[in-house]
Swiss-Prot record:
Transmembrane segments: none
InterPro entries per the UniProt record, alphabetical: Periviscerokinin
Disulfide bonds: none
Stored Pfam families: Periviscerokin (PF08259)
Known tissue expression: Expressed in the CNS and abdominal perisympathetic organs (aPSO). Not expressed in the ring gland, midgut or thoracic perisympathetic organs (tPSO) (at protein level).
Residues found modified as Valine amide: V14
Keywords: Amidation, Neuropeptide, Secreted
CC terms in the record's Gene Ontology section: extracellular region
Keyword Secreted: yes
Signal peptide: none
The protein, known as: CAPA-Periviscerokinin-1
Upper lineage: Eukaryota, Metazoa, Ecdysozoa, Arthropoda, Hexapoda
Family: Belongs to the periviscerokinin family.
Keyword Secreted assigned: yes
Length: 14
C-alpha cells in the first residue's frame, strides 16, 4: 500500500 517513483516511472508499492 502506498506509492513511489523511480526516475520517470510511478508504481504502486506493496
Amino acid at each position: 500500500g502506498g506509492g513511489g517513483t523511480s526516475g520517470l516511472f510511478a508504481f504502486p508499492r506493496v
